[in-house]
């Protein structure tokens, strides 16, 4: 069976000297991993690998994602594939958890008010991943892939009908952003 490339994010925060990691419960009626606790994430969308998506990655952040990911056989992933995984990680984090991993042209994180104003677009982004790139373009934002730390690489077990070749990343929740679960997933 075909394995689809996917990206998953461990959102971290420190609370009273304890490290917390966000997990979300998937809906009971979903076809894949129904009613399971998971980290935000999902498969790469065609738009994540587009030239428009690459243009929404700050040039100084490109080096941080290129060269750090490898295949199961130890071969370095192509830069375009590595960038697509990082963009997918940011898109899925906004889509599923409402946390926007993006910065403005000056490198400043998005304000809580700006993130709140963009929340209604999450449903559109879930239906069409290209809408995330359109949002970044319209708001003149860049995905904040620099702080994403590669954590692990997992393959869905062969007994599952849907299989994913998943890269896991970790990142602290940006200051002043709150998690808001997407109840449709």
Where do the protein language model's features map onto the residues?
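N-terminal leader/linker segments that precede catalytic domains of diphosphate-processing enzymes
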Residues: 1-185
């Amino acid at each position: 069976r075909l394995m689809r490339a996917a990206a998953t994010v461990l959102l971290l925060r420190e609370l009273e000297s304890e490290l917390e990691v966000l997990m979300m419960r998937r809906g009971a009626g979903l076809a894949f991993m129904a009613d399971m606790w998971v980290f935000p994430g999902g498969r790469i969308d065609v738009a994540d690998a587009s030239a428009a998506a690459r243009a929404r990655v700050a040039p100084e952040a490109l080096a941080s994602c290129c060269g750090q990911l490898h295949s199961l056989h130890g071969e370095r992933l192509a830069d375009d594939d590595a960038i697509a995984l990082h963009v997918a990680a940011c898109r899925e984090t906004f889509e599923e958890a409402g946390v926007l991993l993006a910065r403005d042209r000056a490198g400043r994180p998005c304000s809580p008010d700006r993130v709140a104003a963009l929340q209604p677009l999450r449903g559109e982004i879930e239906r069409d991943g290209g809408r995330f790139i359109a949002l970044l373009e319209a708001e003149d934002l860049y995905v904040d892939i620099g702080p994403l730390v590669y954590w692990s690489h997992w393959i869905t077990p062969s007994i599952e009908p849907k299989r994913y070749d998943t890269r896991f990343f970790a990142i602290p929740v940006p200051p002043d952003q709150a998690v808001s679960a997407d109840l449709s997933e």
